[in-house]
Amino acid sequence: MNIHEFQQWVKDYYQQRKWSDLDIFVRIGFLAEETGEVARAIRALEIGRDRPDEVEGTYREHLVKLTEELGDVLGNLLVIANKYDISFEDIL
């Protein structure tokens, strides 16, 4: 899937669930939340979490989690771009 196809998929997916109707400031909050989750995933990969209430995962598990979180950040960026009719290809 190329970036244009992914941007259209995100647009359709969010519209079906009425998530694209949310206020832009709510969306910015979601983006900030997902960015924090990327930071958490990188911390787990690089220095570990060192929390007694969490099971330590493998490097591969942490890498999968980071990949998912980066996808969530990209999805949120695409929703914002879609709101303002900005093509991700134009951004790149």
Residue ranges and their predicted role:
Residues 1-70, 74-92:
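Flexible "arm" and connector segments at domain edges
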